[in-house]
């Protein structure tokens, strides 16, 4: 067998160098792919975290809308010139008013005429501050009846026939806090609750407490 000539050695070196260059290029490609994969991985993780937080927030919001009772978030403070009684606020709106005038007076204050239970409790509360006469107060109308009114006396409230004009006592629910108002408005917007639900519910709770 003939020994390799110098020309053959040069060819072999070139081939070996070319192979080494090819190996180095493959390693460089792998490193470049690994470097570009990290940003995509981080971006995917960030999007996944954001979506998870969005799902959790949506779940909590829906749970609060469907299951949370916002009655526990009421402020408990009646507006100025209103008297707090149970879950309701009351105010004397005027005197010598007809039925239509009484309804209009309460509507101007975003309220309604006082109901019988609150009227009875209010009269019993002011009796100790009345005079010794059999009758010391003005007759005022009730929400529950168009023909029967309440007359405060030292012995307590009594029912009388409504005259043409009476005093006007208005009633409205205690105000809600900001968070409770947002929940209530959302329920009303989604038609999960009637607009007058809070007023009716607060009146029921107030009457239950006073009985």
Swiss-Prot record:
User: What gene name is listed for this protein?
Assistant: UL45H
Q: Which Pfam families match?
A: UL45
Enumerate the SUPFAM superfamilies for this protein: C-type lectin-like (SSF56436)
Q: Which family does it belong to?
A: Belongs to the herpesviridae HHV-1 UL45 family.
Gene Ontology cellular component terms for the protein in this record: membrane; viral envelope; virion membrane
**Keywords, comma-separated and alphabetical:** Glycoprotein, Membrane, Signal-anchor, Transmembrane, Transmembrane helix, Viral envelope protein, Virion
For this UniProt entry, what is the primary localization, expressed as one broad class?
virion
Instruction: Say if the entry is tagged with keyword Membrane.
Output: yes
Chain ranges on the Intravirion side, renumbered to this chain: 1-46
User: Which residues are noted as glycosylation sites?
Assistant: 96, 133
The molecule here is called Envelope protein UL45 homolog
Which parts pass through the membrane?
47-67
Q: How does it sit in the membrane?
A: Single-pass type II membrane protein
Cellular localisation: Virion membrane
The record's section on InterPro entries has: CTDL_fold
List the stretches on the Virion surface face of the membrane: 68-211
- Highest taxon of source: Viruses
């Amino acid at each position: 067998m003939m020994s390799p000539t110098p020309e053959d050695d040069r060819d072999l070196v070139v081939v070996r160098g070319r192979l080494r260059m090819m190996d180095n290029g493959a390693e460089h490609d792998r490193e470049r792919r690994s470097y570009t994969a990290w940003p995509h991985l981080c971006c995917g993780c960030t999007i996944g975290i954001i979506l998870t937080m969005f799902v959790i927030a949506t779940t909590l919001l829906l749970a609060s809308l469907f299951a949370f009772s916002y009655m526990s978030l009421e402020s408990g403070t009646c507006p100025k010139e209103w008297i707090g009684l149970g879950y309701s606020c009351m105010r004397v709106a005027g005197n010598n008013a007809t039925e239509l005038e009484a309804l209009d007076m309460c509507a101007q204050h975003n309220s309604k005429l006082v109901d019988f239970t609150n009227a009875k409790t209010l009269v019993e509360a002011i009796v100790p501050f009345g005079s010794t006469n059999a009758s010391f107060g003005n007759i005022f109308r009730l929400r529950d009846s168009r023909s029967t009114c309440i007359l405060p006396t030292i012995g307590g409230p009594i029912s009388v026939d409504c005259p043409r004009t009476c005093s006007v006592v208005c009633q409205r629910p205690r105000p809600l806090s900001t968070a409770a108002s947002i929940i209530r408005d959302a329920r009303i917007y989604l038609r999960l609750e009637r607009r007058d639900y809070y007023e009716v519910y607060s009146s029921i709770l107030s009457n239950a407490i006073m009985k």
